[in-house]
Amino acid sequence: MKWLNQNVGSLLELTVAHLALAVPAILLSLVIAVPIGWTAQRLRWARDPALALVGVLYAIPSLPLFVLVPVVLGIGIRSSANAIIVLTVYATAIMVRSAADAFSSVPLEARMSATAIGYSTWHRFWSVDLPLAIPVMLAGLRVVVVSTVSLVTVGSVIGIPSLGTLFTDGFQRGIVAEVAAGLIVTVLIALVLDGMCILAGRALTPWARAAEAR
Amino acid sequence: MIEFDRVTKRYADGSPAVADVSFTVPSHKTVVLVGSSGSGKTTLLRMVNRMVDPTSGRVLIDDVDVTTMDPVRLRRSIGYVLQSGGLLPHRTVVENIAIVPRLNGATRPDARERALTMLDTVGLDRDLASRFPAQLSGGQQQRVGVARALASDPNILLMDEPFGAVDPIVRRSLQHELRELQRTLGKTILFVTHDIDEALALADEIIIVAAHGVIAQRGTPTEILTRPANAFVAEFVGVDRPERRLRLADAAGVEVVTDASGRPIGTLER
């Protein structure tokens, strides 16, 4: 508690830094994965290669990637951009599969019927495919949220500030309270963001509960 | 009028789904395509609104080849009812019905008003307007499907096994209601079913489709029942089934109609 009292300021600062890395990566992965997932569902032949490719991405160890991305893109190794790009790669690797599954889960009959009554492809994507994909997509997004919030901490090894900094610093200086604080707040952030996903999902899919209630 | 002119559709592997099919659906009439599954009847139906384009031959609506029309606009001008209504599960009843007027450019309040009127037309309570499809019975979903198809007052109605997913009693009442609606609306209806009794109940003209869309016989329900063109039609219609071979019996002065096995069906009015 003594450590906490003396370091509330830096704890808050690192929490904000943590969120500033995790949230953009999560949102970016969603923006990237949705069109890929939708295309994979429409072009059957593209589905397996696309999923295999993103599967390989996930197999790359994270630490080397934190070092490799700055070299390839010519950005600072300790920059936020580096962390966000690396986190986005892993988040996208998970999210593409979820998005492809989500679009496959849209009932064929709903898609057929939308086309039959005169939706254009573009209009159908926004009005039918995307809303009906939300439940499965959300399940994937929740995994992405939790894993990304956790993965942010790895960046502290190469000096990108986040709650992970409390692990490295606390470990080096032998302050157990600092390590514990980093751990607890990281888990809390994951839980809060996960809860926000659940609430957003409920608000966006009133029909799903109507079907359950019946 | 819808005209099929020597229409053929081949699958990617070259095998025909329908081969060299010609027939017409006269304006304001109900034509029922009836055949077993895989006969190509749904493929034929989908050629009308360009969900499927023929490999060769033409489909004409009022003498205009549909392939010259924009598919999206064509579909908005044609009512379409699918099995179990084909409702969008994430839209309420009133939203589902209002979709087509909205797509055709009606304002939101106008489309909504139109949708509520359509609920009356198909005999549904306006209280159902804000429910989701999953909260309706199968029969109610079908009625909403019909309401949606009629919402933009199209000339043509395509119905693909629309009553296939409801129980026989509800199906019979839906068939009855469709007949009543058609009496006042006079749409040009192309209806697909595998149920010959449904065809007999609804059709001005029945087209019996064998494999690959080959037309085994076309005629009025009475013609099909009394003069089946060949053994296939006779078998399909079931002219030898006990319930088709009716007899008259006398029950204490009342003339009773029975089937071939003697089960009573109704009484005879002269």
Predicted features, each with a name:
Chain B
Residues 109-127:
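Conserved ABC ATPase "signature" region
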Residues 157-161:
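Catalytic Walker B motif of ABC-type/P-loop ATPase nucleotide-binding domains
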Residues 94-102, 112, 116:
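Short helical segment in ABC ATPase nucleotide-binding domains corresponding to the A-loop/adjacent helical element
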Residues 49:
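Helix-to-loop junction immediately C-terminal to a conserved catalytic motif
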Residues 146:
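Hydrophobic anchor residue at the start of the ABC signature
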Residues 132-136, 140-142:
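Conserved ABC ATPase signature
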Residues 151-155:
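A short, proline-enriched helix->beta-strand linker immediately N-terminal to the Walker B motif
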Residues 65-79, 103, 108-109:
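ABC ATPase NBD coupling module
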